Amino acid sequence: MTAFTRFAHSRVSWFFLTGSAIALEAAALYFQYVMKLDPCVMCIYQRLAVFGILAAGLVGMTAPKYRIIRILGVLGWAISATWGLKLALALVDMQNNPSPFSTCSFLPEFPAWMPLHEWFPAIMLPTGMCTDVPWQFIGVTMAEWMVVAFSGYLVVLLLFIVPILSGSNKPSLYK
């Protein structure tokens, strides 16, 4: 087993995934509550995608020696990062090509059985407009930075997918 595979099978690798998602969520809350930048519906959906990556990291951390746990973690990671990238690209398009016919809704469209914007309004209730660009860093908007972040998650996933999925189904009791 290579060092790369051993790292992929360790809790530390999944901790880094979880920690990066926590850092992104903390940054989002900093922008919202300290810098007073209102999140739009697409921002809330992206926030949910980051929570999906966080959850995938927590799943992977539970028992990374077991292949089934790693597979579940990878699936959550892949689905959340892909969905987040799709949302971030759509938001960049909305901001770069504003149209009165292409707007986002005022309330998120969560399922009736899971109204996250009602349960957690401090985190999941949108208060901004999708076409607003209230912040830039080195000429790159927040939506464009999220394209970078989700693309980064997918690149790391591609680097790690073979080592994560390789190896035994369960750890040996005799090593």
Curated annotation (Swiss-Prot):
Broad class of where this protein is predominantly found: membrane
Record field: transmembrane: 14-30, 49-64, 72-89, 145-163
Periplasmic side: 31-48, 90-144
Positions on the Cytoplasmic side per record topology: 1-13, 65-71, 164-175
Pfam families per record: DsbB
Keywords from the named record: Cell inner membrane, Cell membrane, Chaperone, Disulfide bond, Electron transport, Membrane, Oxidoreductase, Redox-active center, Transmembrane, Transmembrane helix, Transport
InterPro entries linked to this entry: DiS_bond_form_DsbB/BdbC (IPR003752), Disulphide_bond_form_DsbB (IPR022920), DsbB (IPR050183), DsbB-like_sf (IPR023380)
Its job: Required for disulfide bond formation in some periplasmic proteins. Acts by oxidizing the DsbA protein.
Protein name per UniProt: Disulfide bond formation protein B
Gene: dsbB
